[in-house]
Amino acid sequence: MSIYTNSKPWTVPALAEAKRNGSKIVMLTAYDAGFARILDANGVDLILVGDSLGMVVQGHDSTLPVSVHDMVYHTACVARGVRHAMLVVDLPFQADASPERALEAATALLRVGAQMIKIEGAGHKLEVISYLVEREIPVCSHLGLTPQSVLRFGGYKVQGRGEEAGGRLRAEARAAVEAGATLLLLECVPSQLAAQITTDASVPTIGIGAGAGCDGQVLVLHDLLGLDSGHPRPKFVKDFLAHGGSVAGAVRAYANAVRDGSFPDVEHTYTS
């Protein structure tokens, strides 16, 4: 049985209200209308059209080959299946290399149904965040492990371990909020650090491999369903379809587990 009762469309003010009320936010990825309908009807608050499609849909080894054209196409598909969830969309690799370039890409995505734009990283990306927010475009700031930086990181590794690295990530989160970010997404971050950032931040945090202390959780849909992407399965992934049932049932089980705090548990969490 689902504990999901909200049928109102999700908005930026609704995110802020969830943070104030301590209501957990449920997020999943989708890349087409069919799966988007299932997510939308089974307790998912935010749907992410992630550039992860480069790996789980297109078969690449990273997200780097994904283009703005790809993101526009898949965003348009997903938008046709959504009635209640908020649609968050990635700017792909180098689409945010300058504020002007980011605005052009974001505008194309908003025109086909995006409601919030996700940008990876901090540093010079803060200028991009401010530039978009000043032009009335909601932004999610993705911090911690940012897959578009995989070449610099030397692989997919936990970020923020140790006092210096943790302090740097907390500073990046504060700067992103000051730049106008409406939402923070924390990936592969020690749970203690993610909880500190969540307490500090005036906006909601969504975790993926960042522990239960975040204001919400996200997973890649293919991971949640146990589909083989040809890549090693991260520690934070749980197969909600492992014991049978339907896709809709797996999505409901995930949504309920996020809301009641049973996912992620220690098994699916990184520590310092």
UniProtKB/Swiss-Prot annotation:
The protein's enzyme class: transferase
Residues spanning the signal sequence: none
The main location is: cytoplasm
Identify which cofactors the protein needs according to its UniProt entry: Mg(2+)
Q: Which domain of life is it from?
A: Bacteria
Q: Which Pfam families match?
A: Pantoate_transf
A GO molecular function annotation here is: 3-methyl-2-oxobutanoate hydroxymethyltransferase activity
Instruction: State where the protein is found.
Output: Cytoplasm
What InterPro entries is this protein classified in?
A: Pantoate_hydroxy_MeTrfase, Pyrv/PenolPyrv_kinase-like_dom, Pyrv_kinase-like_dom_sf
Q: What does this protein do?
A: Catalyzes the reversible reaction in which hydroxymethyl group from 5,10-methylenetetrahydrofolate is transferred onto alpha-ketoisovalerate to form ketopantoate.
This one is known as 3-methyl-2-oxobutanoate hydroxymethyltransferase
Which species is the source of this protein? Answer: Xylella fastidiosa (strain Temecula1 / ATCC 700964)
Q: Gene of origin?
A: panB
